[in-house]
Amino acid sequence: MNEESPPILWVFAGPNGAGKTTLFNDMLRGDIPYVNADEIAHELDPASGGIDALRAGRLAVERRNAMVSRRESLSIETTLSGSSALAFMRKAKATGYHISLAYVGIDTPELSRARIDERVVEGGHDVPQDAVLRRHPDSLRRLARAMEIADSSLVFDNSGLERRLLLQVENGIVSFIDDHRPAWFEAAVSRRFWYSD
């Protein structure tokens, strides 16, 4: 990276089970450090299936804050179910980071649950049902705010067999990529985007 290029923060966001880690692996694995609490939990205790989520979450926050203080590019994963990810995006932007958002949405909390159950069968981590039910609508509710903070955004739907890119925002230019806009997308994305293309 040359001296004029700002560091980059990639934010991979979406409800539990939506496919955030898979999207990161498809887009950037090996290109940029990925601070992911689920992977940290697995590193702490591989045999437990990553059950030490609280400790892993604290370590993830420490790692990403340290990287921002050193102005290193990084990527994070978040459900956007709380305000901490938005605050971190604002903090990074205020220190000169370029913020890129990649959001993966899915239709329902029930689909989240089904995807999580598949992941558990394959040895991945579980998420409590009450958290799944709470985080799905909370994530969608914060999507528009995350897009307003980000310098560029990609919004995907992963409700079907294949992930579809729905919307891209780059340099203030909004491009609708797919004419089929699922109900979750219409409800979550700020109406100001509808009239920008």
Sequence positions of predicted segments:
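The conserved Walker
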Residues: 15-16
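Conserved substrate/cofactor phosphate-moiety recognition/catalytic segment
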Residues: 23-72
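Conserved nucleotide-binding/hydrolysis micro-motifs of P-loop NTPases
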Residues: 39-41, 81, 105-111, 160-162
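Glycine-rich phosphate-binding loop used to anchor ATP phosphates in small-molecule kinases
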Residues: 52-106, 136-139, 146-147, 154
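A glycine- and Lys/Arg-enriched "phosphate-lid" helix/loop adjacent to the NTP-binding pocket
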Residues: 97-145
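NTP-dependent small-molecule kinase module
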Residues: 145-197
